[in-house]
């Protein structure tokens, strides 16, 4: 089977560690999300930060091919990359912009979620110079404490924004801070937003992230913003049975050693063998995005069995105990994240061991790690990102 390449990407021609992305699972998760929302509701698929580490362009193309209406991004650089890749769908920058970016944002026909009058002014001025209308979504800070207009100042600021002649207000939105964990706090934010709905005379609303989508159906308004669930990672444990993770991270055994009882493993001698052991050295480390905090905690899958990580994870290598797998040899595959046989290692599992969140686990996978895309309908052939 031939492979499509992306010349702008630089990946090892002979990778020792790589990621496989399953297009079938991605489409399955899109269908699951569609089943949760009314037919009129549009999806804003969040593809910022390289589509949560999965690869911006291939994921975006597959989402558009699958009917997703809007792509949510971090900044103008991502917008330019998408436009240059031939994607003409609606784009929405979710984060604050700088004044120097306003002109190019308007020229590329990109919407912006704004949290200040200044952003609105910069965009309106740029749009006026170009004879266009700048597209904005107005965010209200109902409890997140990050972006959005403060409710007590909102009406005053909006009166100023409405006087900007080259601005098109496309929607009103907010962002839930505790949709995964606190139903009451989420409902409080929702009710805070509704206080201002009359002010917009029927403008579209979006509030729901992946977690909120499964909290209450009323949160699925005119748009829903879905990120984590698209990639098959459950924002809440009960959702795991509904979603399919689309990413598998693999590497290879590069060395096998027989070591005696009491032998130290890796920097700092943080682990000493409790018995004579067979140790495999794997071709991945924290320099590739595999968290050092997983040292002496995580396992990897080899031949469908869990093999514990021993010692400190190093920049490009880690060690695992394969004493119970005598048939292992150099070159065998190891699964760092994903399924092999009947065993699975999830992003949630690694996040818990690292005392972080699943978002960080997947976005940490370094951009130099080769991504192989399988069963993607937006491309005629299996494609692999490499030089």
Curated annotation (Swiss-Prot):
CDD domains referenced in this protein's UniProt entry, alphabetically: PLPDE_III_AR (cd00430)
Known pathway: Amino-acid biosynthesis; D-alanine biosynthesis; D-alanine from L-alanine: step 1/1
EC number(s) per entry: 5.1.1.1
Keyword GTP-binding: no
Presence of keyword Isomerase: yes
Catalyses which reaction(s): L-alanine = D-alanine
Cofactor requirements of the protein: pyridoxal 5'-phosphate
PROSITE patterns named in the record: ALANINE_RACEMASE (PS00395)
GO cellular component terms, semicolon-separated: cytosol
Molecular function per GO: alanine racemase activity; pyridoxal phosphate binding
Coiled coil: none
Listed Pfam families: Ala_racemase_C, Ala_racemase_N
Catalytic machinery residues: 48, 267
UniProt-annotated binding residues for substrate: 146, 315
List of residues that carry N6-(pyridoxal phosphate)lysine: 48
GO BP terms, alphabetized: D-alanine biosynthetic process
Record key words, sorted: Isomerase, Pyridoxal phosphate
InterPro entries with a match to the protein in the record: Ala_racemase (IPR000821), Ala_racemase/Decarboxylase_C (IPR009006), Ala_racemase_C (IPR011079), Ala_racemase_N (IPR001608), Ala_racemase_pyridoxalP-BS (IPR020622), PLP-binding_barrel (IPR029066)
HAMAP family to which the protein is assigned, alphabetical: Ala_racemase
NCBIfam families, sorted: alr (TIGR00492)
Function comment: Catalyzes the interconversion of L-alanine and D-alanine. May also act on other amino acids.
Family that this chain belongs to: Belongs to the alanine racemase family.
Name of this protein: Alanine racemase
Organism: Methylacidiphilum infernorum (isolate V4)
């Amino acid at each position: 089977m031939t492979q499509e390449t992306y010349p702008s990407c630089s990946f090892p021609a002979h990778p020792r560690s790589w990621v496989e992305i399953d297009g079938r699972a991605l489409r399955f998760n899109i269908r699951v999300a569609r089943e949760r929302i009314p037919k009129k509701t549009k999806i804003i698929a969040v593809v910022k930060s390289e589509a949560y580490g999965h690869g911006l362009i291939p994921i975006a193309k597959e989402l558009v091919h699958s009917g997703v209406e809007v792509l949510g991004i971090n900044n103008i650089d991502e917008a330019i990359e998408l436009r240059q890749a031939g994607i003409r769908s609606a784009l929405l920058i979710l984060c604050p912009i700088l004044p120097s970016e306003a002109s190019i944002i308007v020229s590329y026909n990109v919407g912006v979620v704004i949290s200040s009058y200044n952003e609105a002014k910069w965009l309106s001025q740029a749009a006026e110079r170009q004879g266009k209308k700048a597209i904005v979504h107005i965010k209200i800070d109902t409890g997140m404490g990050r972006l959005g207009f403060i409710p007590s100042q909102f009406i005053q600021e909006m009166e100023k924004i409405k006087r900007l002649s080259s601005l098109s207000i496309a929607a009103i939105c907010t962002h839930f801070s505790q949709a995964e964990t606190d139903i009451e706090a989420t409902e409080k934010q929702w009710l805070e937003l509704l206080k201002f709905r009359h002010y917009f005379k029927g403008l579209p609303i979006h509030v729901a992230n992946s977690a909120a989508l499964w909290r209450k159906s009323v949160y699925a308004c005119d748009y829903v913003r879905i990120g984590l669930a698209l990639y098959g990672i459950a924002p809440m444990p009960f959702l795991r049975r509904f979603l399919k993770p689309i990413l598998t991270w693999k590497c290879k055994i590069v060395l096998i050693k027989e070591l005696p009882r009491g032998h130290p493993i890796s920097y700092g001698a943080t682990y000493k063998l409790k018995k004579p052991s067979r140790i495999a050295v794997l071709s991945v480390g924290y320099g590739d995005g595999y968290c050092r905090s997983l040292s002496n905690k995580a396992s990897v899958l080899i031949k469908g069995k869990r093999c514990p990580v021993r010692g400190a994870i190093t920049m490009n290598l880690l060690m695992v105990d394969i004493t119970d797998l005598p048939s292992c040899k150099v070159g065998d595959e190891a699964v760092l994240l994903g399924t092999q046989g009947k065993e699975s290692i999830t992003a949630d599992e690694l996040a818990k061991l690292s005392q972080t969140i699943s978002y960080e686990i997947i976005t940490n996978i370094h951009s130099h790690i080769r991504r192989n895309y399988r069963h993607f309908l937006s491309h005629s052939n299996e494609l692999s990102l490499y030089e």
